[in-house]
Design a protein with these regions (language model features):
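Short, low-complexity N-terminal intrinsically disordered segments enriched in polar/charged residues
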Residues: 24-53
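Exposed beta-sheet edge and beta->alpha loop/turn motif
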Residues: 96-150
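Short solvent-exposed beta->alpha transition segments
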Residues: 25-26, 42-44, 57-102
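Sec-exported extracytoplasmic/periplasmic mature domains
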Residues: 49-53, 57, 62-69, 108-111, ...
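N-terminal secretory signal peptides that target proteins for export/translocation
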Residues: 1-7
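Low-complexity, Gly/Pro
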Residues: 2, 26, 39, 63, ...
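Short, well-ordered turn and helix-capping elements at secondary-structure junctions
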Residues: 5, 91, 107-111
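Bacterial N-terminal signal peptides
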Residues: 10-22
Length: 150
């Protein structure tokens, strides 16, 4: 190998290494959302959903919109005998202004009174004020009342 070929190869490897490290340092590039609000929403939504899935409703309540917290907690306390076995979350639908989002989550659960698994859907409507990254949820459950009534 000639010195010129070796220098060209070394230069190419150096450029590749610099570009790779630069990509790691700066993370994902999102030109449509430079403040990275979508990531914060995804994380808040995931944490809330996991807390509900593990019946930690007191902690999940921290993510609920202020004027819905008490109603949420009262509804969820009725699930004290429910055992969640899993959940499936659809992708987040974020509006153009990036201040509102909707997510549908399907939980799988059972109760001692119903020894078979049933699915209950939750529609999570997330919102935030301005460019703040504090997302709050208002949730609506479909099929929850029938489960609690049994």
């Amino acid at each position: 190998m000639t010195i010129h070929a070796f220098r060209t190869l070394a230069f190419g490897l150096l450029i590749t290494a610099v570009l790779s490290l630069g990509g790691c340092a700066f993370g994902e590039f999102r030109p449509s959302d430079p403040f990275d609000r979508q990531y914060t929403l995804d994380e808040a939504q995931h944490r809330y959903t996991v807390l509900v899935r593990f019946s930690d409703f007191q902690k999940a309540r921290k993510f609920v919109a202020e004027d819905h917290k008490e109603g949420f907690y009262q509804r969820m306390r009725a699930l004290k005998d429910v055992h969640f076995t899993g959940y499936d979350s659809e992708s987040v639908e974020l509006d153009e202004e990036k201040t509102k989002a909707t997510v549908r989550v399907t939980y799988t659960m059972y109760t001692p009174a119903l020894p078979y698994e049933v699915e209950v859907s939750e529609v999570q409507e997330w919102s935030r004020d301005g460019i703040a990254n504090t997302w709050r949820v208002v949730s609506t459950f479909e099929g929850l009342q029938q489960l609690v009534a049994n």
